[in-house]
Amino acid sequence: MTETARSEASPANLVARLRAAGCAFAEEEAQILLAAAADAVSLERLVQRRVVGEPLEYVVGAVEFGGLRVSLMPGVFVPRQRSVLLVEIAAELAASAATIVDLCCGSGALGAVLATRLPGASIIAADIDPIATECAGVNLAGRGQVYLGDLFEALPQAMRGRIDLVVCNAPYVPTSAIAMMPPEARVHEPQATLDGGADGLDLLRRVAREAVPWMASSSHLVMEVGESQADTARQIFAAAGFAASIRRDDDRGAVAVVGTRDATDRA
């Protein structure tokens, strides 16, 4: 390696380039990029991708989520740390041998972490996007099954009435708000993984409505929403036949709506 190459690959130089590109956590990102690169040439390729705004998770091909390193590929929704709340709620509610579905699974991050926390559970993931299911297949290899299709239509019919818990991080950004999202998301992540329709709750309505015949007699549905959507989401769950409540994690800025059906509920 030449002196010039060494200088350009130095942590201080990387931090300066990342900071100039607007990376808020330049020091941390520099260390991640250095660890991910095999040599100076590959490092430069990674840095060039990052400084033009490509998400760090796409650049290095992975994200740390819920204590697990989750593989990621471009075109798949990047798991946000706030979504760990969904995992924590699901792990709290599910029995050790539960049948759990990670719906709109994306990378399969939720299901993969739940598989590590509930090793006796049966984990099933589903998504309509073949790139997402390919990625989820990597993360759930040896941990669960992955199906391609539209919401519950992806699942085997034998699962009807047998699901103990559905965890779902469906798109919930209102269409009009997409333009205000950070460029990393707005430009690089597929809009279909972000856009939840006029009020952001189109998919939530479908999931709540279509879930009931698939759920066991005592079961739970857990979905992420925005703070301003919480009350409407709770009402949607209630109208679909769930006892609904809202859970928050202020530290993560996370909000989830939780629906419960007990043994006396009927579809």
Where are these regions (language model features)?
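Conserved beta-strand segments of alpha/beta enzyme cores
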Residues: R69, S122, G144-Q145, A243-S245
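Conserved Class I SAM-dependent methyltransferase catalytic core
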Residues: A198-G259
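Residue-level signal for inorganic ion chemistry
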Residues: L33, G53, S83, L110, ...
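Mobile active-site "lid"/loop adjacent to the S-adenosyl-L-methionine
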Residues: A170-D202
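Flexible, glycine-/basic-rich loop-and-beta segments that form/coincide
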Residues: D262-A267
